[in-house]
C-alpha cells in the first residue's frame, strides 16, 4: 500500500481498457468494401445460417461484419458502413454493417424498429 507522500507525488494510474472493436481506431463508423459475403452457423445451442461479410477498410484492415435483418443485396465489391457491436453466438464477428447506407439497402416491409434497419416509414 502506498504512503500519502507517494500518492501525492505519483497519484493512482487508471487501468487502460482494451477496445472491443479495435479496427475502428476509436471512430464510431468506418467505410469499407466487401471482399466476401457468406453464411455461417452459430455456436452451440443455436442453429441458423447467419449472413456475414468480410470487409476491407481503407487502411487495409479486414474484419468480419454481421449483416442484420431479413434479406440483403450485398455482394463482392459493395461499399458498406461498419459499426462496432458483436454478435453473441458468432465467434470472431465483432462488427455490424449499417443498413440503408451506401450500397446496403434497408430491410423491406419493416414496421417496427425501422431506424436500426434503414427502413422508410410506410405510408
Swiss-Prot record:
Entries under PANTHER family matching the protein: 30S RIBOSOMAL PROTEIN S12 FAMILY MEMBER
CDD domains reported in the protein's UniProt record: Ribosomal_S12
Gene from which this protein is expressed: rpsL
An example Gene Ontology biological process: translation
Keywords for this protein: Methylation, Ribonucleoprotein, Ribosomal protein, RNA-binding, rRNA-binding, tRNA-binding
Subunit structure: Part of the 30S ribosomal subunit. Contacts proteins S8 and S17. May interact with IF1 in the 30S initiation complex.
Entry's Gene Ontology molecular function annotations: rRNA binding; structural constituent of ribosome; tRNA binding
Family of this protein: Belongs to the universal ribosomal protein uS12 family.
A family per Pfam: Ribosom_S12_S23
Reported function: With S4 and S5 plays an important role in translational accuracy.
Protein name, entry field: Small ribosomal subunit protein uS12
Residues with 3-methylthioaspartic acid modification: 89
Cellular-component GO terms for this entry: small ribosomal subunit
Amino acid at each position: 500500500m502506498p504512503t500519502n507522500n507517494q500518492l501525492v507525488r505519483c497519484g493512482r494510474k487508471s487501468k487502460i481498457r482494451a477496445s472491443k472493436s479495435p479496427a475502428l481506431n476509436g471512430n464510431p463508423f468506418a467505410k469499407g468494401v466487401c471482399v466476401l459475403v457468406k453464411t455461417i452457423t452459430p455456436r452451440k445451442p443455436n442453429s441458423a445460417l447467419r449472413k456475414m461479410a468480410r470487409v476491407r477498410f481503407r487502411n487495409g484492415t479486414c474484419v468480419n461484419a454481421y449483416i442484420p435483418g431479413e434479406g440483403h443485396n450485398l455482394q463482392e465489391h459493395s461499399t458498406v458502413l461498419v459499426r462496432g457491436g458483436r454478435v453473441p453466438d458468432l465467434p470472431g464477428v465483432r462488427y455490424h454493417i449499417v443498413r440503408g447506407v451506401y450500397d446496403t439497402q434497408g430491410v423491406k416491409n419493416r414496421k417496427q424498429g425501422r431506424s436500426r434497419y434503414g427502413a422508410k416509414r410506410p405510408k
